[in-house]
Amino acid sequence: MRFAWAVLLLGPLQLCPLLRCAPQTPREPPAAPGAWRQTIQWENNGQVFSLLSLGAQYQPQRRRDPSATARRPDGDAASQPRTPILLLRDNRTASTRARTPSPSGVAAGRPRPAARHWFQAGFSPSGARDGASRRAANRTASPQPPQLSNLRPPSHIDRMVGDDPYNPYKYSDDNPYYNYYDTYERPRPGSRNRPGYGTGYFQYGLPDLVPDPYYIQASTYVQKMSMYNLRCAAEENCLASSAYRADVRDYDHRVLLRFPQRVKNQGTSDFLPSRPRYSWEWHSCHQHYHSMDEFSHYDLLDANTQRRVAEGHKASFCLEDTSCDYGYHRRFACTAHTQGLSPGCYDTYAADIDCQWIDITDVQPGNYILKVSVNPSYLVPESDYTNNVVRCDIRYTGHHAYASGCTISPY
């Protein structure tokens, strides 16, 4: 019994030296994190940004030697075309193997090449290792990534962004008719110039403005508005003299005969404003420049006596190419830089804009004549002045107005 207890107590003590002397398997040190690798670089406002990653690096496929042979799984070597191989190099594996001692006597400070994980359909792993080793010997440095450039087209110093009708970056919310054609249909630089385009301000011939009588006849109507909503129009003297009395209040109403207008330049030259650019007037209410003292004049005449029954007013809107016929391109905008009307283009004024009316608050119901004159004072030379006036028959009932018989008249 005593012997059994002695064996149980002394047995573990005798095994301790044996366990200490036994060779222990060395543990591999923990893998150090791989080096950061630059993958993406871009430039913004003069600052260079880089995106670094620890992920695997994609190796593009290399061109193989056509005389190389691939070994089949059965051991026979035969010449056959090889398919591309996708290579991935892992930074963590490279750093771990570099610190592992070499069993074949290789110098410890000499790192092994990075491990590559590959996939190729139709080949065995042994043949893949041979191909990977050959590619490692002939592998060249990967090309540098191309420098990023600004994707926005270069702007011209002598051109304003708001004045280029072909600029797709132009802010055009204030005018829905601006840039309504495809902005990328820019004429080619080496092609023949279209009529009225690319000839600058020095052209042969003269402009010829012609108002559209049918456009006026189709959309003439009567509207009542309060003086509160006519404050901008009152600043530009678009109302009758009775609207400027001292006893007029904001909730008083005015009766307006509204009508649209569309003027075409059917001449061979640009219609440019009569005033120089430095003398254009800025109107803060309507947020545009007036480049002419009087572009149009509106009058309401008695049908029998041809006398003026409603006080007309001057309409000195800004000039621009609202739309053009097929084959012509817009070149002028309603800005402080360029204003005008190109040949083959139209300057359109809708009936619902300010000052596109005649104040008929003091006019009695009856038959009248609406007279719309374009370039009435002949401030800009034209090739023909006999087609600058439109006359329409107006029947006013006190609440409604009916337009008919609109034609072009020489007077």
UniProtKB/Swiss-Prot annotation:
Role according to the record: Responsible for the post-translational oxidative deamination of peptidyl lysine residues in precursors to fibrous collagen and elastin. Regulator of Ras expression. May play a role in tumor suppression. Plays a role in the aortic wall architecture.
Protein name per its UniProtKB record: Protein-lysine 6-oxidase
Residue ranges, compositional bias (Polar residues): 93-103
UniProt GO molecular function: collagen binding; copper ion binding; molecular adaptor activity; protein-lysine 6-oxidase activity
Lysyl-oxidase like: annotated segments: 207-411
Signal peptide from the UniProt entry: 1-21
Gene from which the chain derives: Lox
Cofactor: Cu cation; lysine tyrosylquinone residue
Low complexity composition bias: residue spans: 126-139
